[in-house]
Amino acid sequence: MSQSIIRYRTKPDQADANAELVRAVYAELNRTRPDGFRYTTLRLDDQVTFVHIVRSERDPSPILTVKAFGEFQAGIRGRCDQPPVQQVFTEVGSYRFFTG
């Protein structure tokens, strides 16, 4: 199983466009419903910082087959002031965070 957090900061004029691209990823995920995969995206209160939390039981991750994710990734560097940084994590404890 792999788990990671990806964090980046968009340019202020690109934050809403980024959020729309993220919503398109979730729309496709809700249609295709890949198993063994959990994903959430957070927009922080500064409105330009985004955090993605990914947990996948499969390798490669099913997110790589999502067309909307490819479209999201295609222009990510151009939308960002701070590029995405991915960090692998190990869960210490959780209350219903990855279930349900």
Task: Label the model's feature ranges.
Residues 24, 28-38, 54-89:
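An amphipathic, aromatic/His-enriched active-site/gating alpha helix that lines ligand/cofactor pockets
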Residues 92-100:
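Short, low-order "capping/linker" segments at domain edges
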Residues 2-9, 37-70, 100:
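Short, well-ordered beta-strand segments in beta-rich or mixed alpha/beta enzyme
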Residues 14-16, 60-62, 94:
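Residue-level signal for secondary-structure boundary sites
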Residues 23-25, 44, 98:
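Residue-level signature of transmembrane alpha-helix interfaces in integral membrane proteins
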Residues 43-45, 88-92:
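A general secondary-structure junction signal
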Residues 9-20:
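Short, surface-exposed ligand-recognition loops at beta-strand->loop->(often short) alpha-helix junctions
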